[in-house]
A protein has these predicted regions:
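Conserved SAM-binding loop
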Residues: 6, 33, 81
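Conserved Asp/Asn-Gly motif in the active-site loop of CheY-like receiver
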Residues: 31-38
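CheY-like receiver
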Residues: 41-92
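Residues at the starts of beta-strands that form the adenosine-phosphate
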Residues: 3, 30, 78
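A generic structural motif
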Residues: 25-31
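Conserved acidic segment of CheY-like receiver
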Residues: 2-13, 17-18, 52
Length: 92
C-alpha cells in the first residue's frame, strides 16, 4: 500500500483531499496530514512516504522549499503541488 502525505495550511482543503478520494481503491493510505511545511519535513524524517500532495503557498515553509527538502530526505518521493492562487510564475 502506498503511503500518502497531505500538506496544506487550509484545514478544509486538506480534509477535502483526504475525504473525496477513494484511497483504498488506489491501494493507498493517508499516513500524515500536516498543516505546514516544517511539520511535513519532521514527519518525513520519522516515516517515509511515497507521495506528497502539497499546497504551494503556506506560511513558515512554502511547498516549493518543502519539496526540495523532502527530495533531499527521499529522492524517490513523488510530489504534487497544488495552489488556489493565480500566479503564473508557479506554472513555469
Amino acid at each position: 500500500m502506498k503511503k500518502i502525505m497531505i500538506v496544506d495550511d487550509n484545514y478544509l482543503s486538506a480534509e477535502g483531499i483526504e475525504k473525496n478520494i477513494d484511497w483504498e481503491a488506489l491501494n493507498a493510505e493517508i499516513v500524515h496530514i500536516c498543516y505546514n511545511g516544517t511539520s511535513a519535513i519532521e514527519a518525513m524524517k520519522k516515516e517515509s512516504v511515497d507521495l506528497i500532495i502539497s499546497d504551494i503557498e503556506m506560511p513558515d515553509l512554502d511547498g516549493i522549499s518543502m519539496s526540495r527538502q523532502a527530495l533531499n530526505i527521499n529522492p524517490m518521493v513523488k510530489i504534487i503541488l497544488i495552489s488556489a492562487y493565480d500566479k503564473f510564475e508557479y506554472a513555469r
